């Protein structure tokens, strides 16, 4: 899937490159899609990458923190855009996100048992406000921020087993706030919008082990999502 996503982005990028120089950076660019942003509602889709991690807080000083190794995941989803004012839009961007984090727990004596692979498939539902600057030629930068709700399809929330049998458990539903920036690039037939966004979990997502003195979860006060999303949106 990652290779397919890279291929799609590469082909799209090569196809756009010929237009990009003449239509965006020339001295007198042809203004594309001049009235596109005046639509009350418009739709799109996105492809992208993510890097998810966790922020741990501890009950007592652990000496050595839980080590979080982040990997690159992928995103795909839809975009619905509602124009509120000239420079303000409301956006809904439901998407499917896949990611993996490798956690190493220093309090576990057995080196092999320290590692937990946390693979997650998320249904992600952000509701965002988009603040756009004045359009210059075929470019229009913007800021975006808001709240999101995430459904973790691989949370193991209802599992009876815990880390002592290799099962890492998380809460199924989480809430986040998000903040980022991007730029709208107007081509002849479509608008392309690369963006980068940070995701910050609001509540503890960890389900503790059955043993309150577990070396995995006993000293953890909270575990919250931290993520970076890079999306390439086509309208």
What are the roles of these predicted feature ranges?
Residues 54-68, 99-120, 151-171, 206-221:
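Flexible, solvent-exposed loop segments that connect beta-strands
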Residues 37-41, 49-55, 81-156, 231-235:
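Gram-negative (and chloroplast) outer-membrane scaffold detector with strong preference
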Residues 39-41, 70-74, 119-125, 139, ...:
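Residues that define the transmembrane beta-barrel architecture of outer-membrane proteins
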Residues 174, 182-235:
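Predominantly the C-terminal beta-signal and adjacent terminal strand-loop region
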Residues 28-29, 77-78, 126-131, 179-181:
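Short, well-ordered amphipathic alpha-helices
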């Amino acid at each position: 899937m990652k290779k397919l996503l890279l291929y799609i982005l590469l082909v799209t990028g090569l196809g756009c490159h010929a237009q990009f120089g003449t239509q965006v950076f020339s001295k007198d660019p042809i203004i594309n899609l001049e009235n596109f942003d005046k639509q009350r509602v418009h739709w799109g889709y996105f492809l992208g990458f993510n890097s998810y991690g966790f922020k741990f807080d501890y009950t007592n000083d652990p000496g050595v923190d839980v080590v979080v190794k982040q990997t690159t995941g992928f995103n795909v989803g839809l975009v619905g855009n509602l124009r509120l004012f000239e420079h303000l839009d409301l956006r809904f961007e439901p998407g499917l996100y896949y990611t993996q984090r490798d956690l190493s727990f220093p309090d576990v004596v057995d080196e092999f048992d320290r590692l937990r692979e946390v693979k997650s498939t998320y249904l992600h539902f952000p509701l965002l406000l988009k603040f756009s600057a004045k359009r210059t030629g075929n470019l229009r930068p913007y800021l975006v921020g808001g709240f999101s709700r995430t459904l973790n399809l691989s949370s193991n929330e209802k599992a009876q087993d815990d880390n002592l049998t290799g099962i890492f458990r998380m809460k199924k539903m989480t809430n986040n706030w998000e903040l980022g920036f991007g730029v709208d690039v107007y081509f002849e037939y479509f608008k392309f919008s690369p963006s980068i966004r940070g995701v910050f979990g609001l509540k503890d997502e960890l389900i503790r082990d059955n043993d309150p003195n577990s070396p995995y979860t006993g000293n953890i006060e909270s575990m919250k999502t931290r993520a970076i999303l890079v999306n390439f949106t086509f309208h």
